[in-house]
Amino acid sequence: MLKDAHQKLIKHRQSTKLSMTDFACQAAPVKQPLPLELPLPLSVQLQLLAKTPTSDHAPMHSTPPTTPPTPPPLPLNMSQSASAVTEAATPENSLPATPPSEGALAVPSAPQDHYSLRWNNHQNHILRAFDALLKTKTLVDVTLVCAETSIRAHKMVLSACSPFFQRVFAETPCKHPVIVLKDFRGWVVQAIVDFMYRGEISVPQQRLQTLIQAGESLQVRGLVESSVPEHTPTPAASPDDFGMLDTSMLSSTFEDECPTMVRPSKGGKLLMPSARLFGNASSAIAALGLRRKREQESDRDLESDQELGGSSPMPRRKQARPRRRSGDVPHDFTLNKTDAESLQTVIKHELLERAERDQEEAPDQDNSQGEAEKISSSPAKTLVERAKEQKSMKEEGSDQPRSLNENHHQLELDDEDDDDQDHEEEEEQDIEELIHTTNELRRQAAAAAANAAAMSPNPSPCLSDGPEDLCTTKKGKELISGPSSSADCESNNNNSSKLQDNNQRIMLSLKDIRQLNANPNPTAIHTPTSCSGGNNGLLTFPPPGLRPPGLPDSPPCHMEALEAQMHAAAAAAVAAAGSGEHPFHHMEHQMEMSLAAAAAAAAMHQREPRDPRDGRDHNAFASNLLGPMGMPPFGGHNGGHPGNSGPGNGCPGQAAHERLEESMNRLSKELGKEFGKEFGKEFGKEFGPASPMSLQGPFNAPDGPPHPPSPLPFPGMSSAMTLTPPHMFGLDSPLGLFPPGIDPGKLYNPLMEMSDPRDMPGGPPPFLKKKMPRPKGQHSAPRGGPPRSWTNTELTEALQHVWNKKMTTSQASRIFGIPYNSLLMYVRGKYGKSLKLEQLRKDCISGPPIEMLQMGIGGGSGGSTKNEKSKERKEKEKDKNSMSSNGSGGSANSQGGAPTSGSGPMQHSGELGPMGQLDLDLGLPLGPPGGPRSNSSEPDLLSAPNALFNPFNPQGFYPDFSGGFPGLPLSMLNLLPPAERHHAAAAMHHLGVSMDEDCKSVGSKQSSSVDEDYSGPGIPLSLEHRREISATGPPLTPSNGGTGHD
């Protein structure tokens, strides 16, 4: 039974609502079945009860039992052990535990003891856990898309901190919503998200108004001036009720570990949280320790008078209603203006907090601009003195209320608005003076840097409340330069704000282009100071606030600006070499990506400024910048505009990109003299005109419109074909497919001598040219397709080689560049008579191949005799009912030679009608290849064991056979006279020799025309002459009633 009771205690040990008395009651029946005394099981229970809080739950608060149990020694031991646990687990600055509920005390049997389990650092843990989940993007389920970036977050946290997000998520129940905040900049959304997750952020004063306006638009609790209700809505409320919520969703017990943005201290001061996102890390740690000390002291005073409920011990400050109403469209993200009171209270404390942290420094600069400026020491001293005076005014009443209780705090809350009104006018005056002083100092620095005596700066600040023009107004705190040392402020906030300011720069700086094209860099990027005369003489273009008033705010990115930046980069390299550093790194810092925009800016060099005075001011300003470095000014020595090519121009007829190229070459030579040849080569390789970064297109017509600039960071005006040599992708190259026995040098291809029209210099761009026919590669049939892309010469040579059996069709197709299907149609005779190929075909087929002539087989000469002619006529009259066709047996001297004689028709009997094509069994082309060919007909020409005209097997020719016999090979039938061939064919037919099915329809048009052309009288021939004729040029084979296929 003791084991059972022990297991039950272990099972329910982590319960927070069940009392220990219940466990004792469950274990109480142990004493009845055991024959032991009463104190033994009770002592066991006492050990279990006393051990449980100390061993397993060390950080616990335990309240002593109100009523002792029935045995008298039990309450003493229990209370002692419980009090020991309380002393061990309770820190000094913690709050007392929550009292037991009334429902638990209403047990009818006996009063029960309740143990309150408390997680001391629960709120800190929750905040850190949510922040860690946000940083690692774990379990994120919503994406906030702003003007230039996107931020992922958790719907639960956003809904808990903003009724606006709560209403949006309730009305659009999707798994991962994407909320587009197009009117908000990236740093604003990131700061609001960090404020909701961490409870505090640090904001520069010039950005404070924008942040509060965005917080009011998004109804962020802690940023919006609204009253928080005492009761939270139930989860059973309908989604329509969420629209009525202007206030807090949870009245949680946020205590000393989660301060709001602006909270009252005991002295009535407004305590701004320390710098965590925007400020210095060292000052943030010191301010955080000071704030925690103050909160611990206030908590000690509040601990005695605090109520025992679950509400927050911190008094809530008075707030006003938000701007947004429940009837507004939830996706209307227009910014609302804030009240002057809330803005002044926050700015007032911001001045005081900065004066406490930085006694010897001026306020921080705006990190998002990336612009560094130096200021003289006297204005900084005046700012510090003014901040000290404000601190002394604030600290007059700070020592009085150290021992005030909660009632005094309530009185201070009532007088908070009165204090704000008292200091409102004074602080407003200070802020305006600060802005005036800042603008005056910045304009003086610009005038000193530009050496523009005629352009006197006018310190007339332009105040604006809009969030978009922070780059030009309200820069009261942006004075002292220095690289930022914060670890987490450069990642999203500054990166996003730099993207907005790009359109107001006079040029594309390196930092902006890097952050446009790369991932955000968490480390601070060092940018050298500008226009101050220091920093080793490095001069860059000033930020928008430092420009002379005559210059436009957003001029186009001209080539002149890039050229000036190149000169400035050269000066940076000289200064770096003088200080002992490697000069190329500074050159790369200044010019790495600026030349990438050269291609886009080259097209803009012909564009005139709208106001001629703007161009003159721009050139004067740039010439003043380049004057100390000994560089030539932009507009030439005569002061002419660089876009004009006339007598007033210093470089007539020279475009801006040409001057840039010359300047690059000159800089490369000068740097080679200054730092050695290796550095000059390195500079020329990286930034020279031949590098891909500065490559200009090979076409820029002076009379035509310029090529539009490419939005890419590399030049988009050069085609890939213009960069490729023509021999790399020549479509007319045979690609190494020559047969082994053919010399490629003997083949004439006129297209190989043509130059590639795509590589012609000085022509229009490739995409503006008219579409030219490609030299090769048109896969088209002779009829019914697009125009053929080969010449008649190529086709004639290809057909001549194929018909003479020097090549196969596939070899000729690859060598001569004619598609295989088209060439095959020509080889088979399916072409029109307009190509004049009939004579070539007759010559090639009737004459022997060149190899046969080299073997000693000459072409015979002579015509048909009258006897032969009369004999052939008689045979023709006998077989006029049979299915036959006439052919020609004229001979030729060589390929392409004219036939000198014709042969009469070949007689066949009627029973030889289906056997008229036996001589084509092995693929020997004795007739015109006009009919369909089998797929294996060309290999049969070379692979037949006894092929007669096989050039690779000369042993297959037997010229001594004079007669035919039944066992004669089919190809040898061609050597017999027509009369003897008839008997041999009949004999083979009776022996069962079959024909090739592919050769049954080989008749063509040329058979009848040859009979008509060569039917004239001739010289009588003997049997030997007829054999030579048949051996030299086999006559056309009669077809089985087939007709020519056109």
From Swiss-Prot:
Report the principal subcellular site. Answer: nucleus
Q: Please list the residue ranges that the record marks as compositionally biased, kind Acidic residues.
A: 413-432
Give me the stretches of Pro residues compositional bias: 65-75, 703-714
- Regions of compositional bias (Polar residues) in chain numbering: 365-380
Q: Which residues form the signal peptide?
A: none
Q: Where are the transmembrane segments?
A: none
Q: Which ranges are annotated Basic and acidic residues under compositional bias?
A: 294-303, 383-412, 433-443, 866-881
Q: Which residues form the BTB domain?
A: 140-205
UniProt keyword list: DNA-binding, Nucleus
What are the HTH psq-type domain coordinates in residue numbering? 781-833
What Gene3D superfamilies does this protein map onto?
Homeodomain-like, Potassium Channel Kv1.1, Chain A
One annotated GO biological process: larval walking behavior
| Compositionally biased spans, kind Low complexity | 445-454, 882-897, 912-925
Q: What SUPFAM superfamilies does the record point to?
A: Homeodomain-like (SSF46689), POZ domain (SSF54695)
- Give the highest taxon in the source lineage: Eukaryota
What are the Basic residues biased-composition ranges? 315-324, 768-777
CDD domains, A to Z: BTB_POZ_BAB-like
Region of interest (Disordered), residue spans: 54-109, 290-342, 355-501, 632-655, 686-719, 758-791, 851-947, 998-1046
Q: In which tissues is it expressed?
A: Initially expressed at blastoderm stage, transient accumulation at dorso-lateral positions of the embryo and differences along the longitudinal axis. At later stages of embryogenesis, expression is found exclusively in neural anlagen. Expressed in 4 posterior-most ventral unpaired median interneurons (VUM) neurons, VUM interneurons and one progeny of the median neuroblast (MNB).
Entry-linked PROSITE patterns? BTB, HTH_PSQ
- Subcellular location per the Swiss-Prot or TrEMBL entry: Nucleus
Q: Where is the composition biased (Gly residues)?
A: 636-651
What Pfam families does this protein map onto? BTB, HTH_psq
Question: What name appears for this protein in its UniProt entry?
Answer: Protein jim lovell
Q: Which organism is it from?
A: Drosophila melanogaster
